[in-house]
Regions:
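Hydrophobic anchor at the beta1->P-loop junction of P-loop NTPases
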Residues: 11
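Post-Walker A helix-loop "phosphate-sensing" segment adjacent to the P-loop in P-loop NTPases
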Residues: 28-39
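A glycine- and Lys/Arg-enriched "phosphate-lid" helix/loop adjacent to the NTP-binding pocket
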Residues: 115, 120-184
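ATP-dependent small-molecule kinase phosphotransfer cores
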Residues: 44-131, 138
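Conserved lysine of the Walker
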Residues: 19
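P-loop (Walker A) phosphate-binding loop of NTP-binding proteins
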Residues: 14
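Hydrophobic positions on the alpha1 helix immediately C-terminal to the Walker A/P-loop
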Residues: 22
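NTP-dependent small-molecule kinase module
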Residues: 165-244
């Protein structure tokens, strides 16, 4: 697989949508093709003041810490807690995250990799906001002007009931609302929607989307830098030298 520049790819979706599985398959496919990949987890590698935010959230909202599983469900209280002052505070934090994201991408792009892959992106934070509010949509559009747009931004759609069973952390009603927010955001930022599919089919869908994007990139490059024409020929077919 050939590539002409660094590609930025992100995976987003509700908790339990199967992002980790698809990211592992995607990165494995790229590495098997001889490409160099940098993988970043948004919360661990990008988010500003991550420890402070987690500690403050646990102390203020009294939710559980960790990752939920079918045999060990938990009750998280963080992004599902909403109020006007929390929205204002989150908007400020997301601005800091945007600056951090630009710095992380810039450093990675200079490291010689072919692909930069994100397990969640700033899109996942923006989906926590009330996108039905006109002022918030204006804020989102403004913020999006300053962050790198992924070449491929995958949104893994999932049935809320099935996702909640796989990863029981939030109330089902919130998961439904969160899914709707993602779908609304996907129309705002032109994400590639991966429909709810069996794992193997979703993996194939992602690979096909990648192949189409690479083909389009190569076509765009050829249109921008067309191959030089061969030597001019005379009427009898002999080559004619050309001079400038």
């Amino acid at each position: 697989m050939g590539i002409n520049s660094v590609k930025l790819v992100s995976f987003s979706g509700i908790d339990g949508a199967g992002k980790s599985t698809q990211i592992e398959a995607f990165c494995g496919h790229l590495r098997a093709s001889g490409l160099r990949v940098s993988l970043f987890t948004f919360w661990d590698d990008v988010v500003a003041l991550a420890r402070f935010r987690e500690h403050a959230s646990l102390k203020a909202f009294k939710g559980d810490k960790g990752v939920g599983s079918p045999d060990k469900p938990i009750v998280r209280r963080d992004k599902n807690v909403r109020s006007w002052y929390l929205t204002a505070f989150r908007s400020l934090l997301y601005l800091l995250d945007a600056f951090s994201l630009c710095r992380v991408i810039s450093r990675s792009a200079d490291s010689g990799v072919d692909f930069i892959v994100f397990d969640r992106y700033i899109y996942d934070e923006l989906a926590n906001l009330n996108l039905q509010n006109r002022l918030i949509r204006f804020y989102v559009r403004l913020l999006l002007m300053f962050i790198p747009k992924p070449d491929l931004a995958f949104l893994l759609d999932a049935d809320p009931e099935a996702a909640t069973l796989r990863k029981p952390e939030y109330p089902l009603e919130f998961v439904r609302q969160n899914r709707e927010a993602y779908l609304r955001l996907s129309r705002l930022v032109s994400m590639t929607l991966v429909p709810p599919l069996p794992v193997a089919d979703a993996t194939e869908f992602v690979r096909n989307a990648l192949a189409q994007d690479l083909m389009k990139a190569q076509l765009d490059l050829r249109l921008q830098y067309p191959w030089p024409a061969g030597p001019a020929q005379s009427a009898d077919g002999e080559n004619v030298s050309t001079r400038c």
